[in-house]
Amino acid sequence: MRLLAWLIFLANWGGARAEPGKFWHIADLHLDPDYKVSKDPFQVCPSAGSQPVPDAGPWGDYLCDSPWALINSSIYAMKEIEPEPDFILWTGDDTPHVPDEKLGEAAVLEIVERLTKLIREVFPDTKVYAALGNHDFHPKNQFPAGSNNIYNQIAELWKPWLSNESIALFKKGAFYCEKLPGPSGAGRIVVLNTNLYYTSNALTADMADPGQQFQWLEDVLTDASKAGDMVYIVGHVPPGFFEKTQNKAWFREGFNEKYLKVVRKHHRVIAGQFFGHHHTDSFRMLYDDAGVPISAMFITPGVTPWKTTLPGVVNGANNPAIRVFEYDRATLSLKDMVTYFMNLSQANAQGTPRWELEYQLTEAYGVPDASAHSMHTVLDRIAGDQSTLQRYYVYNSVSYSAGVCDEACSMQHVCAMRQVDIDAYTTCLYASGTTPVPQLPLLLMALLGLCTLVL
């Protein structure tokens, strides 16, 4: 009997041993196909709008979206740094920040196809889990809750990465679920179309559950729990608020509430959440009713260096970034996060791009891993220690902004990271003595038809 118990123990111990793996996360590539180095500052890039771009370099400019040279360099840098990842997360926003009339459906599809071919060329044997961003549609932001030509065409483009079931789902609503590769077979990737919940999407504003995605997510997470699987949730637009200004929520309030309700209900099977959209480097914490951290949401910085036009944002540009996660293949627990970047000014001055380590999460913040508990510790240190806050603030812009994060800045960032719930976020700002800024400028922009360019 003792021998049998010992054999069972050994079997369980062997099954629970760590299986270290790595995966890439890239976001917000925003190719500007018309970028060119020009002596005329008004002829450099359409994505700069009416702003002059003096002294533009071959690798890009902070007022512009990515030239092809920058995107090409970023994907090949991934291959050089970690050539055999288990998989790649690619969370969308591929087209430039230009008005709809300067783009069109054919141009959107052409850009997505061009980037897809590049990634497949550099990583021919790597599974890619790709999501659409709010700019990956025409007209931008206006994602329908049902089938359409763009969903159909992109599903065909991504066919080598998708199962037959995922292709059918993608054509209906641009979301899907895939089993993770690897020997354990105990993990799933859920790719969401969170553009359906975006405040700028007028098509879904009055819907309770666009595309039935919430119900589908409930079903997938329930099934994962029964099967003993862990899940990564992936999307473009995150819930909660932008940290570089006040009171800018991305989801409509009802959708934000529903998403948080689903995640809190199923948090035991959710090993990580991964989003983009911000172009900045940040994270969000979710807590249960007792205040215990239950999930961390990682917002990956963009490849594009483009300076946001969102009202209230100061120094809204960033250096280009790519990110690799270290994880346990058996449990999907996140062990570390390493961000690499290109100093764009330096690359243009030297004529050669150099992708270098910006920081490693565990070393930068002195935590053992990237679990929800550890990220809660990181947030507490950011909120309570000025030097840690300042370090985070530099990382937030991918080492672009060297300015000081003062008290008002600190509250904007900390409240956004700590409170993803809309009412709790507002309470956090008031409790800090900061009066939330009304969204009148955004309303005026919407009336003027300009809101499509801000992110």
UniProtKB/Swiss-Prot annotation:
GO terms for cellular component: extracellular exosome; extracellular space; plasma membrane; side of membrane. Glycans are attached at residues 72, 164, 343. InterPro entries: ASM-like_Pdiesterase_prd, ASM_C, ASMase/PPN1_MPP, Calcineurin-like_PHP_ApaH, Metallo-depent_PP-like. Its cofactor is Zn(2+). It comes from the Eukaryota. Belongs to the acid sphingomyelinase family. This is Acid sphingomyelinase-like phosphodiesterase 3b. It comes from Homo sapiens.
